[in-house]
């Protein structure tokens, strides 16, 4: 276990599990370098080339969707608008990477025959079903990833060998927070603290070097209070910023302007705050010992149930995703976790004291990430294929190989 660089530490990922030197390299040089195929719990792979699903009569339609370089949440919003539905009438088993080619099931309430044309989105099949797709029906995802421009091949091989022995931390990965603008968790924490001014400051006054010049200019205008000019300057794809600014132009206060952002996006901010807290707690748990060896006070998952660890019980260590109603560990594990929460100025109750639709309940997430069927070939480029359980981030595995100091420059 070695200390991670400042960017990772800012996201709560304080450590690497492996102590190998950085391999370097670039992922996602093009979307086809990062393929994601959903795996259902019955083992069915929703493959890019197509999938066979047994239809069942009911009030839902399952759609096989392949998207290239398209944001999952924005796809759902666009699909709902095109079909004249509410966004809650469309469900997914999980959010997939944007800068990638991904294949998954999307379900729509009712019988759907005609689907809209959406750039970079293919609909490869649809089936009547008796229930919506849901996270509980998803085992995970199969990844096929190309790492180009590997600078130190021997370091890449050493890292992959080390991953077979190390207990890999199940961090929430870079894309949960952003690499060009790593602020999703900061926006979420501002919401949880009811800090409208802080939310505005993060949204418009924190400007990062890899943003486009158009975005930088628009943020500067907004930060100076020139809302109308900023609204005109932001490109149309900046949904959140434009929604907030439209309200400010009409004379709204900062909090109600923030509430104009689509609910699904506000929820992503809250979940990013939860993810950041989880990463910090997981890092603190790594300081107490290997993640594959429970210690006194740990919460563990045994046969699908979360309980407190007792000697000889076994089970997988889990760490709370902090929110309303979550149980905390005991003993020295609890002491370490309470210290983190105090430093962050957040209590589990804060997640319940939110407007309806933004309340977030706690859950539990396994402390270690276990890749299945890991295979690779190393020629001019490194090609990896592996399966991760639902919620696992491929970039968490890849960061152990590449060990980037500036993730964006490596394609993360």
Swiss-Prot record:
It catalyses: uridine(13) in tRNA = pseudouridine(13) in tRNA. The active site is at 97 (nucleophile). It holds the Pfam family TruD. Residues 167-370 form the TRUD domain. Its EC number is 5.4.99.27. One of its GO terms (molecular function) is tRNA pseudouridine(13) synthase activity. The keyword Heme does not apply. One of its GO terms (biological process) is tRNA pseudouridine synthesis. SUPFAM superfamilies: Pseudouridine synthase. Keywords: Isomerase, tRNA processing. InterPro entries: PsdUridine_synth_cat_dom_sf, PsdUridine_synth_TruD, PsdUridine_synth_TruD_CS, PsdUridine_synth_TruD_insert, TruD_catalytic. It comes from the Archaea. PANTHER family: PSEUDOURIDYLATE SYNTHASE PUS7L, TRNA PSEUDOURIDINE SYNTHASE D. Could be responsible for synthesis of pseudouridine from uracil-13 in transfer RNAs. Belongs to the pseudouridine synthase TruD family. This is Probable tRNA pseudouridine synthase D. It comes from Pyrobaculum neutrophilum (strain DSM 2338 / JCM 9278 / NBRC 100436 / V24Sta) (Thermoproteus neutrophilus). The lineage of its organism: Archaea, Thermoproteota, Thermoprotei, Thermoproteales, Thermoproteaceae.
């Amino acid at each position: 276990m070695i200390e991670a660089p400042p960017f990772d530490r800012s996201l709560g990922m304080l450590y690497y599990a492996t102590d190998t030197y950085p391999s370097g390299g670039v992922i996602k040089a093009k979307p086809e370098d990062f393929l994601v195929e959903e795996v259902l719990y019955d083992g069915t792979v929703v493959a890019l080339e197509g999938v066979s699903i047994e239809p069942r009569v009911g009030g839902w339609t399952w759609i096989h969707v392949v998207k290239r370089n398209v944001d999952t949440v924005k796809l759902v919003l666009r699909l709902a608008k095109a079909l004249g539905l509410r966004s809650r009438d469309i469900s997914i088993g999980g959010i997939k990477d944007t800068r990638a080619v991904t294949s998954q099931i999307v379900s729509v309430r009712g019988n759907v025959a005609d689907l809209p044309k959406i750039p970079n989105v293919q609909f490869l099949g649809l089936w009547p079903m008796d229930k919506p797709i849901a996270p509980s029906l998803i085992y995970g995802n199969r990844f096929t990833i190309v790492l180009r421009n590997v600078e130190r091949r021997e370091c890449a091989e050493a890292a992959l060998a080390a991953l077979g022995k190390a207990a890999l931390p199940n961090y929430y990965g870079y894309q949960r927070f952003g690499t060009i603008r790593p602020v999703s968790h900061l926006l979420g924490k501002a919401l949880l603290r009811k800090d409208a001014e802080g939310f505005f400051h993060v949204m418009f006054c924190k400007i990062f070097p890899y943003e486009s010049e158009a975005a930088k200019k628009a943020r500067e205008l907004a930060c100076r209070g020139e809302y109308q000019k900023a609204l005109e300057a932001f490109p149309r794809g900046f949904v959140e910023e434009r929604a907030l600014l439209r309200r400010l132009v009409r004379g709204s206060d900062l909090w109600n302007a923030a509430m104009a952002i689509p609910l699904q996006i506000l929820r992503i901010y809250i979940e990013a705050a939860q993810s950041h807290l989880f990463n910090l707690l997981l890092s603190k748990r790594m300081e107490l010992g290997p993640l594959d060896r429970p210690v006194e006070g740990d919460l563990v998952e045994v046969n699908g149930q979360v309980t407190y660890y007792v000697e000889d019980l076994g089970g997988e260590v889990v760490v709370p995703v902090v929110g309303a109603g979550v149980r905390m560990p005991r003993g020295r594990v609890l002491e370490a976790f309470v210290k983190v929460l105090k430093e962050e100025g957040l209590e589990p109750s804060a997640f319940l004291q939110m407007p309806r639709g933004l309340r977030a309940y706690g859950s539990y997430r396994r402390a270690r990430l276990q890749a299945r069927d890991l295979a690779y070939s190393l020629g001019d480029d490194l090609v990896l294929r592996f399966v991760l359980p639902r919620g696992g981030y491929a970039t968490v595995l890849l960061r152990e190989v590449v060990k980037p100091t500036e993730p964006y420059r490596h394609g993360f």
